[in-house]
Amino acid sequence: MTTTIYILNGPNLNLLGQRQPEIYGHETLADVERRCAEVAAEKGFSVRLFQSNHEGTIIDQIHEARQAACGIVINPAAYTHTSVAILDALHAFEGPVIECHISNVHKRESFRHHSYVSLRADGVLAGFGIEGYELAVRRICSLCAGG
């Protein structure tokens, strides 16, 4: 069994810490990776963090994860609400999937209330800031370990 967890991030998350800090905070994607790597290492796992502004590239990473990862944490960002293609790719992945959002999408614009990814996700975290990623990694570690 692989002990790698893929952490996939969608559009504009490369600007984390710079874009709308009143919503997304001041920490960066590098901070997310560092914090997730620490949590995973405590449990004997490793992480591979990836970000893309391009839907097809995210799908390619999900396909790669089929052979290389025990679980996926995904923040599809705006693709959450629009991408049946990402949903279909996640359906082809057999391990656990946790959907993670930094902000509480249910307190925001109504178009953000629907998630295609939730149809596949084993759990959803929203509104916990980047701590949500750490919680997601803890849960994925547990699920990958059979818990």
Swiss-Prot record:
Origin superkingdom: Bacteria
Listed PROSITE patterns: DEHYDROQUINASE_II (PS01029)
Annotated TM spans: none
GO MF term list: 3-dehydroquinate dehydratase activity
GO terms of biological process kind: amino acid biosynthetic process; aromatic amino acid family biosynthetic process; chorismate biosynthetic process; quinate catabolic process
Top-tier EC class: lyase
Keywords: Amino-acid biosynthesis, Aromatic amino acid biosynthesis, Lyase
InterPro entries: DHquinase_II (IPR001874), DHquinase_II_CS (IPR018509), DHquinase_II_sf (IPR036441)
UniProt: substrate binding residues: 75, 81, 88, 102-103, 112
Positions of the record's site feature: Transition state stabilizer: 19
Cross-referenced CDD domains: DHQase_II
Recorded metabolic or biological pathway in which this protein acts: Metabolic intermediate biosynthesis; chorismate biosynthesis; chorismate from D-erythrose 4-phosphate and phosphoenolpyruvate: step 3/7
Reactions catalysed according to its record: 3-dehydroquinate = 3-dehydroshikimate + H2O
EC number: 4.2.1.10
The keyword Chaperone is annotated on this UniProt entry: no
HAMAP family the UniProt entry points to: AroQ
PANTHER family noted in UniProt: CATABOLIC 3-DEHYDROQUINASE (PTHR21272:SF3)
General function of this protein: Catalyzes a trans-dehydration via an enolate intermediate.
Family as reported in the entry's similarity comment: Belongs to the type-II 3-dehydroquinase family.
Subunit structure: Homododecamer.
Name of the protein in question: 3-dehydroquinate dehydratase
UniProt source species: Cereibacter sphaeroides (strain ATCC 17029 / ATH 2.4.9)
Gene name, Swiss-Prot/TrEMBL: aroQ
